[in-house]
Amino acid sequence: MNQLKKSFSPTEGKKDQNNLINDPQKNKQKKQKKLVDMEGLVTHNLSNGKFRLKLENGVEVIGHLSGKIRQNRIKIVVGDKVTVELSPYDLTKGRITYRHR
């Protein structure tokens, strides 16, 4: 009777699943950014670190400061040329990621 019992290990059925999770090509696809980088000019200074920007293609968007710019206390004033990340889901809002000199 003891010969008929088969021990079941909890990791036995998950070997194939772990190979799929650790597949490097799938991880690259997940981490790939879906943002659009554009350059623009600051036209207005709004409250709470938000700015009205005119992009190089003529579209006006509202952009907020990225965390690194806030941490390093980089000042952005009207007339500065900046790089903006736009989400493909809402092209009217963006994140300011770099101030050009």
From Swiss-Prot:
Gene3D superfamilies for the chain:
Nucleic acid-binding proteins
Cellular component annotations (GO), alphabetically ordered: chloroplast; cytosol
Q: What is this protein called?
A: Translation initiation factor IF-1, chloroplastic
Q: Where is the signal peptide?
A: none
Assembly description: Component of the 30S ribosomal translation pre-initiation complex which assembles on the 30S ribosome in the order IF-2 and IF-3, IF-1 and N-formylmethionyl-tRNA(fMet); mRNA recruitment can occur at any time during PIC assembly.
Q: Which family does it belong to?
A: Belongs to the IF-1 family.
Q: Which domain of life is it from?
A: Eukaryota
Which key words tag this protein in UniProt? Chloroplast, Initiation factor, Plastid, Protein biosynthesis, RNA-binding, rRNA-binding
Query: What PANTHER family does this protein's entry cite?
Result: TRANSLATION INITIATION FACTOR IF-1, CHLOROPLASTIC
Please list the residue ranges annotated as the S1-like domain.
26-101
In UniProt terms, what function does this protein have? One of the essential components for the initiation of protein synthesis. Stabilizes the binding of IF-2 and IF-3 on the 30S subunit to which N-formylmethionyl-tRNA(fMet) subsequently binds. Helps modulate mRNA selection, yielding the 30S pre-initiation complex (PIC). Upon addition of the 50S ribosomal subunit IF-1, IF-2 and IF-3 are released leaving the mature 70S translation initiation complex.
Q: Where is the composition biased (Polar residues)?
A: 1-10
**Cellular location of this protein?**
Plastid, Chloroplast
Alphabetized GO MF terms: ribosome binding; rRNA binding; translation initiation factor activity
Against CDD domains, the record matches this protein to: S1_IF1
The encoding gene is infA
Please give one Pfam family short name.
eIF-1a
Question: Could you tell me which residues belong to the region Disordered?
Answer: 1-35
Q: Which organism is it from?
A: Tetradesmus obliquus
